[in-house]
Design a protein with these regions (language model features):
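Nucleotide/phosphate-binding catalytic cleft detector across ATP-hydrolyzing
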Residues: 2-32, 38-134
Length: 134
């Protein structure tokens, strides 16, 4: 849930009146071991998880062995992220973001991973800094 706080403002103001900016949001968390979908909504000022799904991919194994993510795993990561984004859209998410953790920072081809995910899914994609991971 902490990752969701990176994309969900507590409140937005319009014309002096406070309103909630997004009703339902999703994060695709691309980590060293899994690609996780987390869908949440804001209820009474707090985030409530509606769905969480993980798919094991082990990008970190490739990075550990060769310093890069292999072409097959790049393609598989893009396919899994695409499936997560489609699922989030079916669940009515107002905002979807992809947040890449250590694979984006540690792999020699981390930028290629981020580009591939963004091109495949057409949603905002970025690498988190270690201090943002919490």
């Amino acid at each position: 849930m902490q990752l969701l706080r990176l994309i969900v403002p507590k409140r937005a103001t319009t014309g002096g009146m406070a309103r909630i900016a997004y009703v339902r949001v999703a994060i695709v968390d691309v980590g060293a071991n899994t690609l996780r979908l987390l869908v949440a909504t804001r209820e009474e000022g707090r985030l409530v998880a509606l769905r969480e799904q993980r798919v094991q991919l082990s990008l970190g194994e490739d990075i550990e062995h060769s310093g890069t993510i292999g072409k097959e795993k790049l393609a598989e990561a893009a396919a899994i992220a695409g499936a997560h984004v489609r699922r989030a859209r079916k669940l009515g998410c107002d905002r979807i973001d992809i947040l890449v953790t250590s694979p984006g920072r540690q792999a020699a081809n981390g930028r290629e991973l981020v580009s591939r995910l963004a091109e495949t899914t057409r949603v905002p994609t970025r690498v988190l800094m270690p201090e943002e991971e919490g």
